[in-house]
Amino acid sequence: MVHDTDPSPHPISRRALLRHSAALAGSLALPAIVPASVFGARAPSNRIQVACIGTGNQGIGILRRFLGNEDVQIVAVCDVNTGSHGYKTDDQYLGREPARQEVDAHYAQLARSGSYAGCTPYIDFRDVLDRDDVDAVTIVVPDHWHAIMTVRAAERGKDIYCEKPLSLCVRDGQAMVAAVRRHQRILQTGSMQRSNPLNQFVSQTVLAGRIGTVQQVTAYIAPNNFFGPG
């Protein structure tokens, strides 16, 4: 993330306010971890509002991670597929409507009224990015869409989690980095396997030639997925 060096005043966002509040708490020597019960339930207005673009096999997994985070409120889902079976297994039913239903059902369990209908489904990702109340987006779609959506999201002032690979070519990757820096956004990608010590050991072993010449590599990419790797 690039820090703002412009001395002129800027309107403060909910995210910026939360960050400044956290810094202030630290300066007052509060405990590093404060139980949520001290402050009571987190108000919806204090949560980071997230929209999930892409709700297939990988996308629904990311969505569920965010559902388990009390600092986040999922307010929208987006997918061109309304809903269908057969993503990774024949009985798996995923897509835009299943994702919306899961989000609403989750928040309904937490609501005093026992009902919730605050997650809006979209077909076009541009409609999601046009929402001023969306703070961040997840982009879990076919690879050739990553650069387009990331650049557009940065331009619209959203922070971004984008699945790997970030781009299909160096030029697209450079455009993504430039857009994120220009608009001072946060971009994270899901390349955690590269940090896994076991994976690093295997890679180093192969590169060092300790297993001899590699004759064949087999890749597993959701063979039962009728709508692509996502």
What residue ranges belong to the model's regions?
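N-terminal glycine-/serine-/threonine-rich beta1-alpha1-beta2 phosphate-ribose binding loop
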Residues: 2-156, 171-186
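A contiguous active-site-proximal alpha/beta segment in oxidoreductase catalytic domains
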Residues: 159-161, 166-230
